[in-house]
Amino acid sequence: MVTMRDLLECGVHFGHQTRRWNPKMKRFIFGERKGIYIIDLQKTIRYFRYTYNIVRDAAAEGKTILFVGTKKQAVEAIKEYAEKCGMPYVNHRWLGGMMTNFGTIRQSIRKLEVIETMEEDGSINLLTKKEALMLRRKKEKLIATLGGIRNMKNLPDMVFIVDTVKEKIAVQEANRLKMPVVAPIDTNCDPDVVDYPIPGNDDAIRSVQLFCQEMAEAINEGKSLLEQDSDANADEAEVSQEEKDAVVAEAMSEEDFASEDDE
């Protein structure tokens, strides 16, 4: 469980410049120093411990918690700690509709599985060099964007988000689906859109790592309390020739889930 020393050493108490703040965060601010808001760590540790228990209990019930963080300070930590606790993650780019249009996202993941099957059974070698090249490029894009959620068969039960301002679309989708949001909230954030907020710095790498680490520990603790086993490795449906042909044709045309202009 996180300690006050952990929070201080990781700089969790440093907020944004006083000119960049959300007035709704006033109750979480201890004071101001050299133009920077200082977050009240007494409140941080209280919210941290409460939220830790919420996440632990969710994991103990077998629930899925999706990790989200695409800013450069969060990319590595999101992936590392999501994998350590066996949870899905998004750390490349949030695609609009990733949760509210989950069926379409699952179709894109299926295309990734088709391409990988073609590589494994050698059928990709029967294509022209250009077709094979386009397929492999498509595979790389799919893995970058959807690799962290490829095994997520259903919508998550909860979302842990780093930087709710940057990830506002993910927050909006979770709110729309009434999916609980867990997140550190910096002095520029809106606490009203987060179900389980933890006041703290969401920019410093060490602070972000601490938040991710604690969430992973809570999940692993909860999982250890879970007695029933879940079959997380269900067999994939067999890939048909029609699916292979369809994916090849699509790879040769425009991407279905992201335009080149977004790159």
Curated annotation (Swiss-Prot):
Alphabetical UniProt keywords: Ribonucleoprotein, Ribosomal protein
Pfam family, one: Ribosomal_S2
Record flagged with keyword Ribosomal protein: yes
Listed GO CC annotations: cytosolic small ribosomal subunit
Biased composition (Acidic residues): 228-240
A single GO molecular function term of this UniProt record: structural constituent of ribosome
Highest rank taxon of the organism: Bacteria
UniProt family annotation: Belongs to the universal ribosomal protein uS2 family.
Protein name from the UniProt record: Small ribosomal subunit protein uS2
Protein species of origin: Campylobacter curvus (strain 525.92)
